[in-house]
Curated annotation (Swiss-Prot):
This is Cyclin-dependent kinase B2-1. Its EC number is 2.7.11.22, 2.7.11.23. The modification Phosphothreonine is found at T38, T193. Induction: By cytokinin, gibberellin (GA3) and submergence. Down-regulated by the replication blocking agent hydroxyurea. Belongs to the protein kinase superfamily. CMGC Ser/Thr protein kinase family. CDC2/CDKX subfamily. It catalyses: L-seryl-[protein] + ATP = O-phospho-L-seryl-[protein] + ADP + H(+); L-threonyl-[protein] + ATP = O-phospho-L-threonyl-[protein] + ADP + H(+); [DNA-directed RNA polymerase] + ATP = phospho-[DNA-directed RNA polymerase] + ADP + H(+). Transmembrane segments: none annotated.
Amino acid sequence: MAALHHQAAAAPVTTTTDGGELRAMDLYEKLEKVGEGTYGKVYKAREKATGRIVALKKTRLPEDDEGVPPTALREVSLLRMLSQDSHVVRLLDLKQGQNKEGQTILYLVFEYMDTDLKKFIRAHRQNLQKIPVPTVKILMYQLCKGVAFCHGRGVLHRDLKPHNLLMDRKTMALKIADLGLSRSFTVPLKKYTHEILTLWYRAPEVLLGAAHYSTPVDIWSVGCIFAELATNQPLFAGDSEVQQLLHIFKLLGTPNEQVWPGVSKLPNWHEYPQWNPSKVSDLVHGLDADALDLLEKMLQYEPSKRISAKKAMEHPYFNDVNKELY
């Protein structure tokens, strides 16, 4: 992992490296499987000593030459730094050992959240209910705040999507999770692999093969999530990289050098059908003028023109949010 410029005090996390799986299961009782993340299974569990309900993420990864699963350890390192923020899921503990096959097993112990944004949106869609406008606003404010915190610490998430945004149904608290693909970024920008992100929330520069990208990739994802909160439907639902680009171009207009200088030099650029841009207000119903303005600023083609998460928090759309609560 690249060096982080903004080192913060690490959250207190105890690490156990002896006893392996047996030891972890002595401490926690699995209650139910609640999902599978990109890199492992997630269980709702009870800490035997305290009765506290936690989320237990079991990760078994191929090891590198040094015997360390790099993706999981990257996630741990980032979470230790980012856990201090109320909008990033808190890493409580870490257990490491080996299973019977000699593979490294990591149990990451997180605070438990009872749902995620994907389930929350799906429940409203199935009930034919729109998410209330004030709820959309407080969820979006928390998302922008969490992303701004990560970016301020030099971390790109790179896989923001409703499934990775955990929620508390009662309080409407929202927390960013699944930092397994995150990267610290430095200046000048590094070349990054573009085999990342769920297609629907993937920024156009990544789809077009850009090797250099930065925080605006997360902002594009935030904009897609914003539109989905307003409509209960994904804004760009492609099933391949080409289809995803065509969905975007059809709605926002096919980009050119005037709109996005350098776009035709990107590796995956071809001659695409020419579509004229639609108004965002025609695409996303249920948002007021301030909300539409913010959404437009998030979905700019040229990455450098996208609003930052920090600036988004200061947008007039959030003027009536009680920021002390979040």
